[in-house]
């Protein structure tokens, strides 16, 4: 695997950029608040410790868009009450970065948290290529129209031993044929590795082939917590959601 070069303090949809958003003490504050809200975590896999805090369109809007909106109505007030300052910092940061108005969609889920728990077991056979995807969740959350532009962001809050990463393959959704097999491509082509840094938000347009990466050790232990979401641009500006 190759280390991925990133560009900081600017954003170009053709590259991945990294931006400092939180100090380490603020990451700890967010982490502790996420732990205090464990009753609101939603288990996403019966076999591994994978949870979300927040409604995620790529999971909740796939079969029933109305169920996604209902989940958003239920959990958004909890997120606002506990992380309003974080949401606003990210929103204002994107306004500075993009030079356009940025807001949260009224009906859509606020950005939320991915939570993975690792128990120190050997996961050396884990293959990020089996998770390779393009961020096409807007097709479920906003059916019938494609946004003018898109973005996806991930803000690392907590890492297990061995850290965490993003895997990216140098292929863009708009450059492939309709019958492109993302999983087959990822399994047969090398990826580039971007190691996450706590408090530094990673931004891309979501349309580069990518996947949740691995820890740098075979037996990670602890939590991988990220604050994340997406953006969609229309004539009025950018809307952030998850």
Regions flagged by a language model, labelled:
Residues 1-75, 81-88, 92:
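N-terminal auxiliary "cap/dimerization" subdomain that precedes the catalytic jelly-roll/cupin core
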Residues 22, 114-119, 134-136, 155-159, ...:
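Short, flexible loop/turn elements at secondary-structure junctions
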Residues 176-242:
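Catalytic core of Fe(II)/2-oxoglutarate
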Residues 33-34, 153-156, 225-233:
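Short, Φ-rich (hydrophobic/aromatic) sequence segments
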Residues 111, 148-151, 200, 225:
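Residue-level detector of short, conserved catalytic/binding motifs and their immediate flanks
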Residues 121-195:
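Catalytic core of non-heme Fe(II) oxygenases with the double-stranded beta-helix
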Residues 1-9, 120-131, 190-213:
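Generic detector of solvent-exposed, compositionally biased contiguous segments
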Residues 62-125, 139-145:
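Signature of the catalytic double-stranded beta-helix
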């Amino acid at each position: 695997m190759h280390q991925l070069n990133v560009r900081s303090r600017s954003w170009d949809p053709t590259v991945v950029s990294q931006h400092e958003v939180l100090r380490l003490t603020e990451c700890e504050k967010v982490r502790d608040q996420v732990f205090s809200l464990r009753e609101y975590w939603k288990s996403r896999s019966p076999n591994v410790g994978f949870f979300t805090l927040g409604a995620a369109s790529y999971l909740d809007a796939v079969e029933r868009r109305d169920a996604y909106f209902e989940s958003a109505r239920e959990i958004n007030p909890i997120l606002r009450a506990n992380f309003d300052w974080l949401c606003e910092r990210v929103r204002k940061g994107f306004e500075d970065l993009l030079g356009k108005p940025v807001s949260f969609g009224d009906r859509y889920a606020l950005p939320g948290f991915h939570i993975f728990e690792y128990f120190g077991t050997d996961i050396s056979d884990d293959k990020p290529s089996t998770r390779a995807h393009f961020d096409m969740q807007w097709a479920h959350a906003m059916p019938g129209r494609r946004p003018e532009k898109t973005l996806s962001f991930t803000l690392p809050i907590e890492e297990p031993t061995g850290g965490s990463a993003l895997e990216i393959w140098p292929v863009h959704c708009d450059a492939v044929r309709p019958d492109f097999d993302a999983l087959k491509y990822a399994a047969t082509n090398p990826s580039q590795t971007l190691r996450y840094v706590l408090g530094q938000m990673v931004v891309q347009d979501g349309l580069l082939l990518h996947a949740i990466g691995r820890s740098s050790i075979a037996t990670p232990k602890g939590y991988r917590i990220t604050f994340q979401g997406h953006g969609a641009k229309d004539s009025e500006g950018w809307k952030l959601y998850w």
